[in-house]
Design a protein with these regions (language model features):
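Gram-negative bacterial Sec-dependent N-terminal signal peptides
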Residues: 2-31
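N-terminal periplasmic/intermembrane-space "pro-region" immediately following the signal or transit peptide
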Residues: 18, 30-138
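Outer membrane beta-barrel
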Residues: 107-147, 152-295, 313-314, 318, ...
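Outer-membrane beta-barrel translocator domains and adjoining extracellular loop/strand segments
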Residues: 135-140, 198-208, 241-247, 295-313, ...
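Membrane-topology and secretion signals of cell-surface/extracellular proteins
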Residues: 290, 391-393, 490, 495
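Detector for outer-membrane/organellar transmembrane beta-barrel domains
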Residues: 312, 323-441, 445-446, 453
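C-terminal closing repeat unit and adjoining cap/tail of repeat-based domains
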Residues: 450-464
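Outer-membrane beta-barrel "beta-signal"
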Residues: 453-455, 481-495
Length: 495
């Protein structure tokens, strides 16, 4: 009985011990389970973060795809609109082509003997409203130069006003003709409306007639810089590139015959570029042989080649040397001719001299520094009435003169100009060669100022011109002074 009781207690103790041991045995398993749970949570968090990142990238890709779809749709719409516009344009072109096809073609310009020639029309339309307080030499309005002195023909002291369109000019330029393999041809015909008026009736003043100014051909060799000009053109004493700027005095420039000399004559000019094709200052030499000219002898000897300058073969010979830089150019020119005052028939009496020599030297230039413009020419000569010197008095008369113009460009549109010129023939020579019962012209001075506005092919200006003339009385014994003023409003359209 004791043994059984003792054995029972032992069994109970063992059971209790096992029961107590069970939690302890479970502790490692629990720790292991907790470790596994922690690892699973970390992985899930990383996976969730990756999923979120991928979802964000997916959303961005979807947005990009949507944007590309929108752009593609817009491009397709634009392309469709462009295609529609192109089709409409093609339809319009087709309609125009049909209309053009119904218009008969203009005949092509041909010369027959000079194929390939092209023709260009250039010129300008000019109108000048003027008022002046004297009648002027050469005419009133656009060709007025200095006032007529007391005792002179057509003198008038009253105010003269009008609107003058005679400066209007046009010319035809011909280019493209081939002389041979090395030489090409071109030409020009130039006209204006200073050919007088259509009669003397009540309406003649509104009918100015055409006048030929120039008609010449050029034969040029581009490889050598050589040009021959044949026909009627400006002589080498006329400072064509240096003419004072004016919208009222174009055909008859400011100071013409009163500081500006030169005229147009038939003949031939040789022009040679001395340093053709080289860099730096450009040098050119010109030489001209021109028809002789003079006033008289006789009242009807100024036309039909009957002047003293046409007697025998005595052409005018001129030469000019020109240098041209970047913003400047200058020239020196010379003139010579011999005049037989007996006339073509050799029968005219010559109480003073039977012949005389016409000579002149001229120097001039222009300079355009910045916004400034300067032009100036001076000359000295003898018996140069044939080239508008000596105040258009014909005889063995010494003369000296010149002009200066200065301008300033405020901007591309507005420019102001100031001008002064003088011509002073020798007084003793004038008295000796003065025609009977006419004033002898001793000295002319001209001043001018203008404000010009230019836009595109249009020019407008207001100009004021003041002229002073010293002269003799009609008997040659007394001296007198005459002054005149002219105010003009001018418009010009170039084409």
């Amino acid at each position: 009985m004791k043994t059984n009781r003792y054995g029972g207690r032992k069994a109970i103790a063992l059971s209790v011990a096992c029961a107590l041991m069970l939690p302890m045995a479970a502790v490692p398993d629990l720790a292991h389970a907790q470790s596994r749970s922690k690892k699973t949570t970390s992985r899930e968090a990383a996976l969730e973060s990756r999923v979120n990142q991928l979802e964000q990238q997916l959303a961005e890709l979807k947005a990009m795809i949507q944007e590309q779809k929108t752009q593609t749709t817009e491009a397709a719409t634009t392309a469709q609109a462009a295609q529609v516009q192109s089709q409409q344009t093609e339809e319009k072109v087709a309609k125009v082509e049909k209309v053009v096809a119904t218009v008969p073609p203009k005949p092509a310009f041909t010369t027959g003997t000079a194929p390939g020639v092209s023709l260009a029309l250039h010129g300008f339309i000019n109108a000048s409203a003027f008022t002046q307080n004297k009648a002027y030499t050469y005419g009133n309005g656009a060709n007025s130069e200095y006032p007529i002195p007391a005792g002179g023909a057509n003198r008038a002291d009253g105010r003269v006003s009008g609107v003058d369109v005679r400066n209007t000019r046009f010319w035809l330029d011909f280019t493209g003709a081939k002389f041979n393999e090395n030489w090409a041809g071109s030409g020009r015909i130039e006209m204006d409306f200073f050919g007088g008026f259509n009669g003397t009736g009540a309406y003649a003043g509104s009918q100015p007639e055409l006048r030929m100014r120039q008609a010449y051909m050029d034969i040029a060799n581009a490889s050598t810089g050589t040009t021959f000009r044949i026909g009627q053109m400006w002589d080498l004493m006329f400072p064509l590139d240096y003419i004072p700027q004016s919208l009222s005095h174009i055909a008859f420039p400011l100071g013409y015959g009163s500081g500006v000399i030169g005229w147009r004559f038939p003949g031939a000019i040789w022009m040679q570029e001395l340093n053709h094709g080289s860099e730096g200052t450009k040098w050119r030499f010109d030489m001209a042989v021109l028809q002789g000219s003079w006033n008289g002898p006789g009242a009807n000897a100024t036309t039909n080649y009957q002047t003293a300058g046409n007697a025998g073969f005595k052409p005018q010979v001129e030469a000019r040397l020109t240098a041209k830089g970047g913003n400047w150019q200058a020239f020196v020119a010379g003139h010579y001719s011999k005049v037989d005052l007996h006339g073509v028939d050799g029968l005219t009496a010559t109480p003073i001299k039977s012949n005389l020599k016409s000579t002149a030297v001229e120097l001039g230039g222009l300079w355009t520094p910045g916004k400034f413009i300067f032009k100036s020419v001076v000359y000295t000569g003898n018996a140069i009435g044939e080239v508008f010197g000596d105040l258009s008095q014909f005889g063995d008369i010494k003369d000296k003169g010149g002009y200066l113009q200065a301008g300033y460009k405020f901007d591309p549109h507005w420019t102001v100009y100031a001008f002064a010129s003088v011509s002073k023939p020798d007084e003793n020579d004038v008295l000796r060669w003065r025609a009977a019962n006419t004033p002898g012209l001793l000295k002319s001075r001209q001043k001018a100022a203008s404000l010009q506005y230019t836009t595109g092919p249009f020019d407008f200006s207001v100009e004021w011109i003041h002229a002073n003339l010293d002269s003799t009385t009609t008997n040659g014994l007394g001296r007198q002074k005459t002054a005149g003023n002219e105010l003009t409003l001018n418009g010009n359209y170039r084409f």
